[in-house]
Regions:
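Extracellular lectin-like interaction modules
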Residues: 1-442
Length: 442
């Protein structure tokens, strides 16, 4: 039955209700302190000026505005929830039929070691005004119809076991973040330190701004699924032992250190996988793809390894040392505005290799069942080791030939051509050459 009706209830008690028999109220404003517990069922909207208990707070109400609340374990079941600050020394549990919003403040809206369970019908914060938290662990937070936006204490590592906003954005800001399961329409993560992830499923776009490293909990399955991944990583992105396994359609990512990633195509639409950019400023790039052709706009690193089971089309690839490419199909760099700029180029292809604007010092190209077409910077001295089943057509500057072998024909345009030993250098059906010099007396 209804026990208390009033405009405002001010109380200082030892206990206020029990778990079996909650105090039934219909008041407008609450100012309550309890030495132990508070069990309360409010029949209408409620404004909490202060609610303090040393042990449990279990509150049911309609739309609720909280200025100040503190306890050991706090459980709220309300309509809309407007937050000032809630502090729990052990855990908080929320069930909200509307939205969770926070006021403008310097401090935190939620402070607790564990946000045990949060079921939100609407949104949890907004993109412009996230919920400010001081939390160690989120066991589960789910928004059914809107966004989840959290700004956690930047000095803490936030561990998230489950977070879902299938119809909205998830926006996370924290010191470091560990995520075991995530589901959302769009995702934005910013950290001061590392991001450790597993089982992230995003329908559309992911934006990462990571102050440390990105690593995975395990590499036996796809760690991140999305249509588009954008990233700015100040550390590394994956390792050789634990590469980041992606299922995406497009990637644009810059890291200061190494990048190790393997990928599948997310959408089975017959289109190329797009690498808008995959750049390591100070480390290596290792990119493996398995189930579609790949179109590369910009890829850069100290050493770059590129493997694919289908065709590779490249606009710009730059490696300070070695570029290694492997495909059972074809590799093409046919854009004259682009370039393959490397110290050493190694290509192992099945059907065809075509490079129209190379800037290469040493080229080793092997084509099992096709042709080689290679145009290098005429001002660049180059050493070549070329082998193909069919014709080889090259335009080069000063050239040292280790070998050029083919069952077809060779068309060689170069400046000075030299060799460094007495081994067999050229093998072909027909050699057509236009050069300044061809060998030397020595």
């Amino acid at each position: 039955k209804l026990h208390i009706t009033a405009n405002k209830l001010t109380a200082n008690v030892n206990t206020f209700g029990t778990s079996e028999h909650k105090v039934q109220t219909e008041i407008q404003t609450l100012d309550l302190e309890s030495a132990k517990n508070v069990y309360m069922n409010q029949k209408a909207d409620l404004k909490v000026e202060k609610l303090k208990a040393n042990e449990t707070i279990d509150l049911q109400a309609k739309d609720t505005t909280i200025k100040e609340m503190s306890g050991k374990d706090i459980k709220l079941d309300v309509g809309n929830l407007s937050l000032g600050t809630i502090k729990a020394t052990e855990k908080i549990e929320l069930k909200v039929l509307g939205n969770v919003t926070g006021d403008e403040r310097e401090g935190y809206h939620l402070e607790t070691p564990v946000l045990d369970k949060a079921e939100i019908t609407g949104g949890f914060g907004t993109l412009d005004q996230p919920i400010k938290t001081n939390i160690d662990v989120i066991n589960s937070i789910v928004s059914r119809n809107s966004d989840i936006c959290i700004f956690n204490n930047l000095d803490k590592t936030l561990t998230i076991n489950t977070i879902e906003a299938a119809n909205g954005w998830i926006q996370l800001v924290a010191g470091e973040i560990i995520i075991n399961h995530l589901l959302s329409k769009n995702l934005s993560i910013s950290t001061e330190g590392d991001l450790t992830l597993d089982d992230l499923n995003i329908y559309e776009r992911v934006i990462l701004n990571i102050g440390g490293n990105v690593q995975v909990i395990q590499s036996t399955h796809n760690s991140l699924t999305a249509q588009m991944l954008n990233g700015n990583i100040r550390g590394f992105f994956g390792t050789s032992e634990m590469p980041i396994r992606l299922k995406t359609d497009c990637i644009s990512l810059v890291a200061n250190n190494d990048i190790y990633t393997t990928s599948l195509k997310n959408t089975d639409d017959g289109q190329d996988y797009i690498v808008d950019q995959l750049v390591s400023n100070n480390g290596d790039v290792v990119f493996e793809h398995v189930d579609s052709s790949v179109n590369i706009n910009n890829m850069k690193g100290t050493n770059v390894t590129l493997k694919n089971n289908d065709d590779i089309i490249a606009h710009m690839i730059e490696a300070k040392e070695t570029l290694f490419i492997k495909t059972p199909q074809s590799f093409k760099s046919i854009d004259e505005d682009g370039s393959i700029k490397v110290e050493k180029l190694i290509i192992n292809a099945g059907k065809k290799v075509k490079v129209v604007n190379g800037d290469v010092e040493n080229a080793e190209i092997y084509v099992n069942d096709g042709t080689i077409d290679f145009i290098n910077n005429l001002d660049k001295d180059i050493t070549v080791n070329l082998e193909a089943k069919e014709d080889i057509n090259v335009t080069l500057g000063n050239t040292v030939i280790e070998k050029i072998y083919t069952d077809g024909n060779i068309d060689l345009n170069a400046k000075d051509v030299a060799v460094q030993n007495d081994k067999l250098h050229i093998k072909a059906n027909k050699l057509t050459a236009k050069v300044n010099t061809f060998g030397a007396s020595e």
